[in-house]
Amino acid sequence: MAITQNYGTGRRKSSTARVFLRKGTGNITVNNRPLDEFFGRETARMIVRQPLELTKNTESFDILVTASGGGTTGQAGAIRLGIARALVEYDETLKSELRKAGFMTRDAREVERKKVGLHKARRATQFSKR
């Protein structure tokens, strides 16, 4: 018998997360490591759990995540979006609740490119009057 699972893709900054949602006991595995081991910061773990806590599904799913690219914050945001999309695939009625909380929106902010003649994207050399 095939395992029924729901899939969601999430992206943030330069990170991508592929999320597989299965009926289970609440285990979240990121790149074959438990969530608490993968993310050192509590904030990142909270971000990942937000959609599940909002929909009161913390104990009803096992989540398998493959995250790549970017850093901790970007990956946490990507996983959150992926989980939200997978939950909507599982149950369409959760969409309005997740949308209202802002979990269905792809954060479009990207790093601004460095400009020629400047130190960074906007940082110029110090202005000298004389």
Swiss-Prot record:
GO terms for cellular component: cytosolic small ribosomal subunit. It comes from the Bacteria. GO terms for molecular function: RNA binding; structural constituent of ribosome. Gene3D superfamilies: 3.30.230.10. Keywords: Ribonucleoprotein, Ribosomal protein. GO terms for biological process: translation. NCBIfam families: PRK00132.1 (NF001099). Belongs to the universal ribosomal protein uS9 family. This is Small ribosomal subunit protein uS9. It comes from Xanthomonas campestris pv. campestris (strain ATCC 33913 / DSM 3586 / NCPPB 528 / LMG 568 / P 25). The lineage of its organism: Bacteria, Pseudomonadati, Pseudomonadota, Gammaproteobacteria, Lysobacterales.
